[in-house]
Curated annotation (Swiss-Prot):
Entry-linked PROSITE patterns: RIBOSOMAL_L9
Record family assignment: Belongs to the bacterial ribosomal protein bL9 family.
GO terms for MF: rRNA binding; structural constituent of ribosome
Entry GO CC: cytosolic large ribosomal subunit
Native source organism of the sequence: Deinococcus radiodurans (strain ATCC 13939 / DSM 20539 / JCM 16871 / CCUG 27074 / LMG 4051 / NBRC 15346 / NCIMB 9279 / VKM B-1422 / R1)
Protein name according to UniProt: Large ribosomal subunit protein bL9
Function in brief: Binds to the 23S rRNA and protein L31.
SUPFAM superfamilies: L9 N-domain-like (SSF55658), Ribosomal protein L9 C-domain (SSF55653)
Alphabetical list of NCBIfam families matching this protein: L9 (TIGR00158)
Keywords associated with the record: Ribonucleoprotein, Ribosomal protein, RNA-binding, rRNA-binding
Gene name of this polypeptide: rplI
InterPro entries xref list: Ribosomal_bL9, Ribosomal_bL9/RNase_H1_N, Ribosomal_bL9_bac/chp, Ribosomal_bL9_C, Ribosomal_bL9_C_sf, Ribosomal_bL9_N, Ribosomal_bL9_N_sf
GO biological process: translation
Subunit structure: Part of the 50S ribosomal subunit. Contacts protein L31.
Pfam families: Ribosomal_L9_C, Ribosomal_L9_N
Length: 146
């Protein structure tokens, strides 16, 4: 039996048409909402959904590229309490997101890549993953508060 996968699984990716045994499709995949039978109407619906998903992904990528052009060359500067070059605590993803928010950029803290824990005063390379295909490199400058 041919089915269209609605969720990624070991059988394939979402939207793929795969061939499975009739009992597996009728007793597990379809009742669990993991797949629908591959009829002509379901295929047309799938094609329309895939087109809308592609449009949405193209729009998201355009927004990410716009953000990348605005964030290009931006250095995030944080002033933290420190003693002898060591920070009391650590600089977190949330601290960087708050600093970017103050600069006028609305970013998701979970998409900020910091290569290591920042516990010392200095300059670090960080990145913001705005989209799976768009990564924005930035500098993080941490200095001691006076």
């Amino acid at each position: 039996m041919q089915v269209i996968l609605l969720e990624p699984s070991r059988l394939g990716k979402t939207g793929e048409v795969v061939s499975v045994k009739d009992g597996y499709a009728r007793n597990w995949l379809i009742p669990q909402g993991l797949a629908v039978s591959a009829t002509r109407t379901n295929m047309k619906t799938l094609e329309a959904q895939l087109r809308s998903i592609e449009k949405r992904q193209a729009q998201e990528k355009a927004v990410a590229e716009d953000l990348a052009s605005r964030l290009n060359g931006v250095a995030v500067e944080l002033s933290v309490r420190a003693g002898e070059g060591k920070i009391y605590g650590a600089v977190t993803h949330q601290d960087v997101a708050n600093s970017l928010d103050q600069l006028g950029f609305d970013v998701d803290r979970r998409k900020i890549d910091m290569p290591k824990t920042v516990k010392e005063v200095g300059e670090y390379d960080i990145a913001y993953r705005a989209h799976p295909e768009v990564t924005i490199p930035m500098k993080l400058v941490v200095h001691a508060a006076k």
